Structure formats: C-alpha cells, structure tokens
Amino acid sequence: MELKGTTILAVRGAQGVTIAGDGQVTMGQSIVMKHSARKVRRLYNGRVVAGFAGSTADAFTLFEHFEAKLEEHRGNLVRAAVEMAKSWRKDKYLRRLEAMLLVADNEHILVLSGNGDVIEPDDGIAAIGSGGPYALAAARALARHTQLDAETIAREAMRIAGEICVFTNDHLTVESAETQA
C-alpha cells in the first residue's frame, strides 16, 4: 500500500502524548488539492488522539469503526485496536480500504495497518505516511538529544519532514490526549 500526501507523527513525553499531522491533500503525484485538511482528531472525550494517512474517505470509515470499538471497550485503547484489527482483517469491505491509523492515549501509541497489524513502538515515537520516515528520524534525534516536551518535538520534527517530503506541508494540526481524572 503506497500512501502519498501526508505525515502523521506521535510523540509521548513526560506530560503526555501529542499527535501532529500536516494539512496537505494530494491527488495523484502532482496536484495539491488542499493545504489545511485536519487529519488528526481527539476521540473518547479527548483521552485518545488519532491521525490517519491514506485515502480520506477510507480513513473516515476507519475512524468511525475505531471510535465504535473505543466506546464498546470503554476507552481501552489496546483492546479497541486489537478488535479493530480483527475486524479489518475479516471484513471484505474493510480489507480494501487504503489507510493507516496512528492512535494514542497517555500510555500507548499504536499503529494500525491495513494488513491488520497493531504495532506499538518501543521508544514512544511513531509516524505514518509519506513523510513518516523523516518525521520519525527527526523526532528520535530531538528526543534523544534535547529536553524538549512532546509537543515541541512533534512540531519541529513535522517542520523538518515538510522541508524534505514534497507530500507534506507545514500547516499542522496538533492534538494532545487529556489526562484521565
């Protein structure tokens, strides 16, 4: 699955988790359709943050399914993600969707792939989309060699990815998960 046109980055720090996403929507290899799309949003009363890469229509379908799983499992991110992945693998319609989700709460960051994978990074940093490798590398370097908070790392890493990846811009949506009371 070749995903073009976006970068989504999650960074967990001492104060919680932040997900940042750029706003560019690209049609094919050469047409920028929109600069200010929102590909990151809060779910489950603000306790979960999610972003997507891939087809917009497919991603919204997956968001709806994931949000339903979150409600069904009372906000348990890992359980909802595993159940979502099972559904994704079994359902003939969902299997054809070309999108990936990056979901996080203050304890876990998970990548949900179209193959039904649920992957949790070891270092609390994950990225998806065409600019994902650049954002991931920049975020890891910043996390290892600075005292910056998660949001600052996410913003700066996304800025760097936007300088390198032509499918990523600097119009960011940045959301942080709320701490449970």
From Swiss-Prot:
Cited InterPro entries: ATP-dep_Prtase_HsIV_su, Ntn_hydrolases_N, Proteasome_sua/b, Proteasome_suB-type
Principal localisation: cytoplasm
Main enzyme class: hydrolase
Intracellular or extracellular location(s): Cytoplasm
Activity regulation info: Allosterically activated by HslU binding.
CDD domains linked to this entry: protease_HslV
GO molecular function terms noted in the UniProt entry: metal ion binding; threonine-type endopeptidase activity
Record has Protease as a keyword: yes
Catalytic residues as annotated in Swiss-Prot or TrEMBL: 6
Reactions accelerated catalytically: ATP-dependent cleavage of peptide bonds with broad specificity
Binding site for Na(+): 162, 165, 168
EC number of this enzyme: 3.4.25.2
GO biological process per UniProt: proteolysis involved in protein catabolic process
Keywords: Allosteric enzyme, Cytoplasm, Hydrolase, Metal-binding, Protease, Sodium, Threonine protease
Function: Protease subunit of a proteasome-like degradation complex believed to be a general protein degrading machinery.
Family: Belongs to the peptidase T1B family. HslV subfamily.
Quaternary structure (record): A double ring-shaped homohexamer of HslV is capped on each side by a ring-shaped HslU homohexamer. The assembly of the HslU/HslV complex is dependent on binding of ATP.
Protein name per the record: ATP-dependent protease subunit HslV
Organism for this UniProt entry: Nitratidesulfovibrio vulgaris (strain ATCC 29579 / DSM 644 / CCUG 34227 / NCIMB 8303 / VKM B-1760 / Hildenborough)
Name of the gene: hslV
